[in-house]
């Protein structure tokens, strides 16, 4: 940032706004939700450094609590060997060097990790001594007597000196790690951010609105600053009327937000070098609103045309900060006091500052805390004599010094217990020995300890997975002459669907790939008002594919469109009338109460039946229209994302079909049927619906992509072009398309009426097999859902899933990508017949014939960021759901059709809701590639995006040799490390034999059924 200080102020501000994209959430409006790395702005750093930087900047937790990891250790999800190996992997030096007698550093650190470093504060420790048997613990008693604790900092100093030093340190944080709001909250207990948010949120929601706001600011077209300032003159119930002269001051501000910002910033931060840091901290106080405003600023074409500039937002935030802190200072001091005078004010009143600071010391005795709180409350109501502040400060100072006790006796007693030391053993140790023991145990920071636990956690799962792959290597599990080949999305949820299908129909072969199936496109369905991108979010499609009425269906389309438009229009009128009309609203509400109650009872008591009935009635009213694809363009045109080409030329279709089939290794041995199986999710009352859809389709449904690919692959012109390129699809093969609803496990089939008669029997058989597989998959999903039936039959499980999908009160219609942990890139035979618990992304790739790695390079570049984005968003939303996630769905309200808030007054919540991650196990994605280490090394060496992900350890990569099956794990510091472990796995006949009755994560197992 230093170079930016040499630029003119406008360029500096533009540079600062650009830099904010690296620290603020980058979540698109919620209807376009796409998984991404929550810490995308730190991805250029190694994983450990990035987490440390993010925690320092935001205060968020970046690892699971140690207590959760210790629960895993107790339950066997982490073994002692895993923890010991993690110390080696982390790079702790001299692990086998003795520290005290025969105790090595490894022994001491392992004991410290097992016990933990969290000690109760002095107040809690005193209670334990009085109320429990802690005082009788011989180890604790020994250390209370014998351990020489370093005196608490400042214990012998004059309390005025302590107070002044603490006050200077706090003031020094302003502009660096704190805003004035944070300092004043520390002093007063009053948070001006609560008022700021209340003032801002309705204006922000209206300005960013995407179609729901009933009120529009007349000045909205002039930008956010102008619109907000205009409200000071127009709003009869303005939020800031309690502030003296605020309305007049705001109305007389300069018209330019830049001029206002340059006028206000020096009042908050006189040092220009701290301006960016202050703006950054100010933005991070409301990261959701700040991030959405910035996203709309950076993506101007994704709204309704309302001008949105981050400069406007920052100007309003800075102005509010100054106005509200001035008001709080006036009330705090009892008279006008500027921010510039605040340091001197409390430097002259150290006794008052010390009493206020005492309220932030939870270890103080309750009586002293009560007296401090009472005196601060009296100060709010009137004047408090300085003598009272001084008397209480003198009593608080020694207690505050004692509260800083680091709990060494507690920690040393617990550590000794883990090491198996008795008081007799300790008597034989010198003071230097005890100091060395304590120093060694405390040598790891909390972040380092968290990462070591994460390494152990990941290793345990990795060992299970490598054992499974090794045990499965000799099994040739691919059918030689498949009756059908089913191409599904790489999505981890489809791992279960594929496994059950192969158990039911062992002669079916399955493949996995990114769910846009190599066809990046805009799609416009028959009833869609506009086009939608169906491809990875980093891809800009330039082709538009449309769903059109089939020949002879033009009349049906006209009637369908008219009835649908009428239904939607009356729905909208009823909705708006009940919201806005003073008379019609209550009348309509009263008239609709009885049918609304009946509907509510039905959707609550029998949601599945009600949902299916409503869908049938809607279809009967609107009428069904047979459709076809507007697929082929006669000539290529110069296309852009803004002006896309309608359809694809023959050459473009040939190119896309060939590239995709070669990528997944399907170039010969075609079955009679090839099913392209996209996916999406459907549920009710679910603002985060896009988060359950296909990530490779920008959080939309992948069915249209499957349909387009199948239609292209069936065209004679395309097949002729493919044959000329050496890829022959025989006339005995037909492509069909369908979409899997991952929520209710239903299937929507496309264009079956165009299937030639000779394939009809095979299609009917495949329809039955797919339906049976989805029912079996629903039964497996039930085991992780607390409200699902226990060990249900497949039919009952499917009915339960239909009910969940239609239940408006269901916060967990499905679990999404929860528990995702790994990705396999290789032939299906490496994983077919393995129970992987729906935790693995399965991506098809045939290493035979790809000696230079060009094909797998493309797969890694496309699938790597997608899988990493999903895994990392789940990771961070799990470890700190309050900061990186969006809390509970139960309290969410949709705001402006672009996000969710908690209740009616909160920050905009980004990330994943708790119900999506509550069973997730946070770990980095393990990517196993069926290729040699040499080829993968060359690929990473020439691809900076992969270097960032792999060398910075955001994902973990392993190579499985295509011939020998040997597995090597990649470590950026040490290169490729050969794996050698046990390859013994339990074996069962069917998946249900392994998961029935189980509700917790399951280790891999070999499934004997379904493999020929």
Swiss-Prot record:
It holds the Pfam family DabA. Keywords: Cell inner membrane, Cell membrane, Membrane, Metal-binding, Transport, Zinc. The keyword Kinase does not apply. It is a peripheral membrane protein. Its cofactor is Zn(2+). Coiled coil: none annotated. It is found in: Cell inner membrane. It comes from the Bacteria. Part of an energy-coupled inorganic carbon pump. Forms a complex with DabB. This is Probable inorganic carbon transporter subunit DabA. It comes from Dechloromonas aromatica (strain RCB).
């Amino acid at each position: 940032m230093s170079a930016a200080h040499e630029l003119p102020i406008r360029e500096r501000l533009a540079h600062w706004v650009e830099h904010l994209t690296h620290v603020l959430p980058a979540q698109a409006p919620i209807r376009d939700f796409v998984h991404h790395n929550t810490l995308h702005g730190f991805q250029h750093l190694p994983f450990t450094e990035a987490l440390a930087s993010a925690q320092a900047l935001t205060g968020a937790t970046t690892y699971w609590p140690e207590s959760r990891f210790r629960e895993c250790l107790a339950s066997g999800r982490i073994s002692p060997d895993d923890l010991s190996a993690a110390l080696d992997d982390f790079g702790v030096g001299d692990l086998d060097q003795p520290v005290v007698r025969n105790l090595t550093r490894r022994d001491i650190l392992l004991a410290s990790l097992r016990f933990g470093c969290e000690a109760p504060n002095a107040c809690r420790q005193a209670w334990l001594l009085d109320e429990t048997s802690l005082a009788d613990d011989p180890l604790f008693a020994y250390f209370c007597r014998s351990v020489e604790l370093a005196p608490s900092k400042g214990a012998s100093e004059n309390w005025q000196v302590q107070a002044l030093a603490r006050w200077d340190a706090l003031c020094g944080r302003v502009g660096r790690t704190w805003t004035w709001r944070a300092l004043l909250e520390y002093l007063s207990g009053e948070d001006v951010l609560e008022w700021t948010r209340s003032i801002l949120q309705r204006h922000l929601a209206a300005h960013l609105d995407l179609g729901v706001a009933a009120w529009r600011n007349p000045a909205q077209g002039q930008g956010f600053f102008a619109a907000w300032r205009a409200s000071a003159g127009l709003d009869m119930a303005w939020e800031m009327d309690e502030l003296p002269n605020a309305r007049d001051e705001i109305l007389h501000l300069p018209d330019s937000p830049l001029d206002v910002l340059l006028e206000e910033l020096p009042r908050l931060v006189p040092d220009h070098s701290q301006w960016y840091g202050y703006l950054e901290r100010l933005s991070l106080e409301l990261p959701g609103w700040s991030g959405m405003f910035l996203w709309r600023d950076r993506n101007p074409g994704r709204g309704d045309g309302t001008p949105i500039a981050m400069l406007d937002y920052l100007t309003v935030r800075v102005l509010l900060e100054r106005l509200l802190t001035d008001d709080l200072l006036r009330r705090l001091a009892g008279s006008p006091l500027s921010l510039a005078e605040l340091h001197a004010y409390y430097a002259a009143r150290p006794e008052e500052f010390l009493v206020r600071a005492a309220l932030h010391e939870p270890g103080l005795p309750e009586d002293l805390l009560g007296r401090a709180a009472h005196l601060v409350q009296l100060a709010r109501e009137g004047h408090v004599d300085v003598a009272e502040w001084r008397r209480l400060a003198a009593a608080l100072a020694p207690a505050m010094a004692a509260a800083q006790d680091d709990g060494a006796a507690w920690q040393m007693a617990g550590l000794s217990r883990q090491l198996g030391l008795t008081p007799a053993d300790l008597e034989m140790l010198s003071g230097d020995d005890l100091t060395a023991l304590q120093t060694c145990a405390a040598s790891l920071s909390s972040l380092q300890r968290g990462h070591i636990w994460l390494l152990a956690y990941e290793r345990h799962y990795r060992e299970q997975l490598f054992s499974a792959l090794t045990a499965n290597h000799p099994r040739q599990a691919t059918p030689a002459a498949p009756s059908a080949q089913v191409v599904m999305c790489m999505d981890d949820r489809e791992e279960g669907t594929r496994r059950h299908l192969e158990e039911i129909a062992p002669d079916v072969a399955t493949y996995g790939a990114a769910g846009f199936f190599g066809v990046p496109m805009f799609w416009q369905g028959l009833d869609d008002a506009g086009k939608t991108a169906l491809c990875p979010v980093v891809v800009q499609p330039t082709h538009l594919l449309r769903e059109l009425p089939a020949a002879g269906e033009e009349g049906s389309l006209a009637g369908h469109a008219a009835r649908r438009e009428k239904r939607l229009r009356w729905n909208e009128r009823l909705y708006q009338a009940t919201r806005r009309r003073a008379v019609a609203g209550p009348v309509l509400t009263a008239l609709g109460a009885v049918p609304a109650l009946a509907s509510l009872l039905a959707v609550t008591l029998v949601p599945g039946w009600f949902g299916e009935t409503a869908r049938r009635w809607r279809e009967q009213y609107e009428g069904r229209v047979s459709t076809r694809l507007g697929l082929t363009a006669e000539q290529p045109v110069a296309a852009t994302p803004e002006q896309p080409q309608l359809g694809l030329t023959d050459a473009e279709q040939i190119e896309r079909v060939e590239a995709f089939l070669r990528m997944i290794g399907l170039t010969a041995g075609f079955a009679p049927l090839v099913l392209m199986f996209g996916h999406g999710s459907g549920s009710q009352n679910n603002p985060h619906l896009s988060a359950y859809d296909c990530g490779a389709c920008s959080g939309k449904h992948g069915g249209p992509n499957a349909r387009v690919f199948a239609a292209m692959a069936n065209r004679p012109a395309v097949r002729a072009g493919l044959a000329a390129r050496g890829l022959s699809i025989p006339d005995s093969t037909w492509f069909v398309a369908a979409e899997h609803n991952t929520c209710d496990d239903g299937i929507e089939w496309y264009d079956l009426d165009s299937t030639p008669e000779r394939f009809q029997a095979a299609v009917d058989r495949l329809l039955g097999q797919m339906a049976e597989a989805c029912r079996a998959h629903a039964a497996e999903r039930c085991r992780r859902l607390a409200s699902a039936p226990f060990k249900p039959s497949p039919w009952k499980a499917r009915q339960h899933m239909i009910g969940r999908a239609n239940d408006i009160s269901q916060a967990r219609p499905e679990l999404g990508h929860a528990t995702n942990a790994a990705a396999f890139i290789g032939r299906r035979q490496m994983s077919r017949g393995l129970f992987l618990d729906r935790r693995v992304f399965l991506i098809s790739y045939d290493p035979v014939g790809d000696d230079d790695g060009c094909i797998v390079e493309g797969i890694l570049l496309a699938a790597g960021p997608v899988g990493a984005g999903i895994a990392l968003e789940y990771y961070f939303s799990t470890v700190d759901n309050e900061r990186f996630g969006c809390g509970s769905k139960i309290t969410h309200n949709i705001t402006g059709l672009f996000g969710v808030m908690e209740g009616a007054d909160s920050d905009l919540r980004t990330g994943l809701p708790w119900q999506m991650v509550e069973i997730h196990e946070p770990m980095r994605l393990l990517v196993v590639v069926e290729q040699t280490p040499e080829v993968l090394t060359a690929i990473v060496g020439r691809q900076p995006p992969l270097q960032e992900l792999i060398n910075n350890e955001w994902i973990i990569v392993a190579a499985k040799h295509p011939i020998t099956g040997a597995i090597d794990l990649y470590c950026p510091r040490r290169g490729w490390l050969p794996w050698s472990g046990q390859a013994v796995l339990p074996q069962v006949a069917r998946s249900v034999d392994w998961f029935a009755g189980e509700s917790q994560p399951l280790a891999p197992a070999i499934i004997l059924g379904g493999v020929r």
